[in-house]
């Protein structure tokens, strides 16, 4: 048996856009993502699936059913977000002292008068409904992490189709410092309205995915799909500023911890000669971001500077982890190799002979230990595993995946890392962004026609873990690689 500390919590994470819609009156058409997945050109190009989020699992209307199942599973922690566009569907007056010509946003003035002014523009029906959802969550004894941003931006801040076509004269999302100002105001306002129900805050989920896939990995089908290294750097610079200003805004109304949730891969060398490639990949993909919001070190243009207004803007780290990335040293740097990690054939085996998921992601649980211990050794900030899961409709691999990754969290804790919870992705199947409904990550299977939720076998395994606070002897055999032979037929 592998027992966890009594204070450790098992739970789940989910996102508004992916889960909320699907019942009458739940539609939220005022976001960049909604416009993006409905765009006929995106569909024709195969950038998006053609599945529509308004046909989703229906959490907005059926949240009590979701919470009932979580309670039966013995879960004790949840991470949800408020959809910005539901609260402010229409443009707000420009912030005071806003100067778009300034690249650096070192302060966003937020006071009670400003919050009251924002309150006049807020959608009270949406606010009240979120309060009902969060109150129901808390009434079941769940610890609650409220995340401010899980990818969709209000349309009045980002028109992704215009940007995709090269028109930057309209709302341009994270390319504009206006979005930095507005995100700080939004985050402070949400904390002001919901602080009585919240235990901890996160500013953002996976900002590196937004800046990376939106402007570099444009085949992924993420908005705005405009290929430009320069614009990717600008977006990430503004996202870092937005996190820091949101941190300040939340802290102006709350004393509770504020973290950020980041997409992580475990970088592994192809051979022993490729360790330098691992260090380079970690710096490029992880440390540069956290050094900015913890140490204030950031690159502006070609110059590395220290900004005190960015320093120390983090209380905890949310670790999202699914698989690894194998890297190889080259003359000019390094390359990521296909056939491993995210770059595998679906429902097959990787070049290492490890099984792959419906998404083509390699089974590699030891990478979670690698990521957790490296964060701890570098920053000594406490952590949650805020996403970990697998696209596996048949639920063949998920029981193995679940137990094997929870075991790696146990290893990390025993090695000294301060990890306080494991939040699986996700409780139920949901809308997997550009891939639509084809990728099913849920412990609960969703019938999208009836909205009924069914328990997969892995949900029973997770209940065993959560209710005992341990990987019990009865399920310890699942801490292993799933047999791969059936996947070859």
Swiss-Prot record:
Pfam families: Glyco_hydro_1. Its EC number is 3.2.1.23. The active site is at 206 (proton donor), 387 (nucleophile). GO terms for biological process: carbohydrate metabolic process. It is an enzyme of class 3 (hydrolase). Homotetramer. This is Beta-galactosidase.
């Amino acid at each position: 048996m592998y027992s966890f500390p009594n204070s450790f919590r098992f739970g789940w994470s989910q996102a508004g856009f992916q889960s909320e819609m699907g019942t009458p009156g739940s539609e939220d058409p005022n976001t960049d993502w909604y416009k993006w997945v409905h765009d006929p050109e995106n569909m024709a190009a195969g950038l998006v699936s053609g599945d529509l989020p308004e046909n989703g699992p229906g959490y907005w209307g059926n949240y009590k059913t979701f919470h009932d199942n979580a309670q039966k599973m013995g879960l004790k922690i949840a991470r949800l977000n408020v959809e910005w566009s539901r609260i402010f569907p229409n443009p707000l007056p420009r912030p005071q002292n806003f100067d778009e010509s300034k690249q650096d946003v070192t302060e966003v003035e937020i006071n009670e008068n400003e919050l009251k002014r924002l309150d006049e523009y807020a959608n009270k029906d949406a606010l009240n409904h979120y309060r009902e959802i969060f109150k129901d969550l808390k009434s079941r004894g769940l610890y609650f992490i409220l995340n401010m941003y899980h990818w969709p931006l209000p349309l009045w801040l980002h028109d992704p189709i215009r940007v995709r076509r090269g028109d930057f004269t309209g709302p341009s999302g994270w390319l504009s410092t206006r979005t930095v100002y507005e995100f700080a105001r939004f985050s402070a306002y949400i904390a002001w309205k919901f602080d009585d129900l919240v235990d901890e805050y996160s500013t953002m989920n996976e900002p590196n995915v937004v800046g990376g896939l939106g402007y570099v990995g444009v085949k992924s089908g993420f908005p705005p799909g405009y290929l430009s290294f320069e614009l990717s750097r600008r977006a990430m610079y503004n996202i870092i500023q937005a996190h820091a200003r949101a941190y300040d805004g939340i802290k102006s109304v709350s004393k509770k911890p504020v973290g950020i949730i980041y997409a992580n891969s475990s970088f592994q060398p192809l051979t022993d000669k490729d360790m330098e490639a691992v260090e380079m990949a970690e710096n490029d993909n992880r440390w540069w971001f956290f050094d900015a919001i913890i140490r204030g070190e950031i690159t502006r243009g070609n110059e590395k500077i220290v900004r005190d207004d960015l320093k120390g803007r983090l209380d905890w780290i949310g670790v999202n982890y699914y698989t690894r990335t194998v890297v190889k040293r080259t003359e000019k740097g390094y390359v990521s190799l296909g056939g491993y990690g995210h770059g595998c054939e679906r429902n097959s085996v990787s070049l290492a002979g490890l099984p792959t998921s419906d998404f083509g992601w390699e089974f590699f649980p030891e990478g979670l230990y690698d990521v957790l211990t490296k964060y701890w050794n570098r920053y000594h900030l406490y952590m949650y595993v805020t996403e970990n899961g697998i696209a596996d409709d048949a639920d063949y691999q998920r029981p193995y995946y679940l137990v094997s990754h929870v075991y790696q969290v146990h290893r990390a804790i025993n090695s000294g890392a301060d990890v306080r919870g494991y939040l699986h992705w996700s409780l139920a199947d949901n809308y997997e962004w550009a891939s639509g409904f084809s990728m099913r990550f849920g412990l609960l299977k969703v019938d999208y026609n009836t909205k009924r939720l069914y328990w997969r076998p892995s949900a029973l395994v997770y209940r065993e873990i959560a209710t005992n606070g341990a990987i019990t002897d009865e399920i310890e055999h699942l801490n292993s690689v799933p047999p791969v032979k059936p996947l070859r037929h």
